[in-house]
């Protein structure tokens, strides 16, 4: 028994020495102080257990798992994490700034006074346009605003099919710069290049809308009778009629600069119903207007140009007395009751009522339609750029 015990003690002694040496090796080779301390304590606990049984297996596995824990990430990984976070924050800040600039550009259209199509106006073309010959200081500012809003549209949608619109925004016809046709086509705000140009547009170019308006002639004429007055000028215009923009010229608009005028539309249900059925009406664009235009005998509106060549102005004759004349691009024409006349009002034009006072006023119903050669993608982009005020 003693020899057995002695032999046992001899065998156990070297074993403990080996365990102690292994524990010292763990301690000496540890690259991190905290990791080495953890390993030293674990090794000591393992070595101190002389008799291990099956019931000790869970505890041993738990202690052994401490040895296999991953070491801390190196300092370079932490630096990369910080750099990634900084770049992410910078990207989010850039996106915020980009969105803010887009919203400022979209909301500044009407405040800058540059992106407007103007009302129908007594000129049959919408009065002096911003950036046109009567306002030489607006051209560059308007051009820059249109370019910014077009870029905002492209970021939201696409540049596909925007070649002409992009060229128009970058090199719009400022004062005296619009090439036009023989110098008589000078749109004041937007010149869309490569559009077929003629002072008068064939009726077939807008056949559906022309036929719809002409078939609605009786209803539109009744609506005018319901809102008409004596146009004497001795009393203020009744509700819905605009003050005369020129002597002898009055108008009542159902749509003004792309915005519906609800009270006037309710008073003219037949005309409003016809407008709702049109396919090419510029109802969501500041270039789009619709309403009654009245010219009294003796009134004359000297030559001027409309704001853009992207639209065609449709005149439906309601009351056309003798002596009325429309000259567009040097070509004279006259209206006819119940028939439509399509005019490119970006050409220089003049309107006159040379009849006698007994003849009564000349009355036409005017609707702004898209030029038939403006593509659908271009219309969508221009509706975005020249969206009416909310």
Curated annotation (Swiss-Prot):
Localization of this protein: Membrane
Primary site of residence: membrane
Listed Pfam families: Asp_Arg_Hydrox
E.C. number: 1.14.11.-
InterPro entries linked: Asp/Arg/Pro-Hydrxlase (IPR007803), Asp/Asn_beta-hydroxylase (IPR051821), IPNS-like_sf (IPR027443)
Bilayer topology: Single-pass type II membrane protein
Coiled coil (UniProt feature): none
UniProt key word Membrane: yes
Stretches of the chain found on the membrane's Lumenal side: 96-390
Bias (Gly residues): 41-51, 128-137
Membrane-spanning parts: 73-95
Membership in a protein family: Belongs to the aspartyl/asparaginyl beta-hydroxylase family.
Protein name: Aspartate beta-hydroxylase domain-containing protein 1
An example molecular function term from Gene Ontology annotations: dioxygenase activity
Modified residues (Phosphoserine): 129
Signal peptide: none
Renumbered residue ranges of the record's region Disordered: 1-54, 116-143
Keywords: Dioxygenase, Membrane, Oxidoreductase, Phosphoprotein, Signal-anchor, Transmembrane, Transmembrane helix
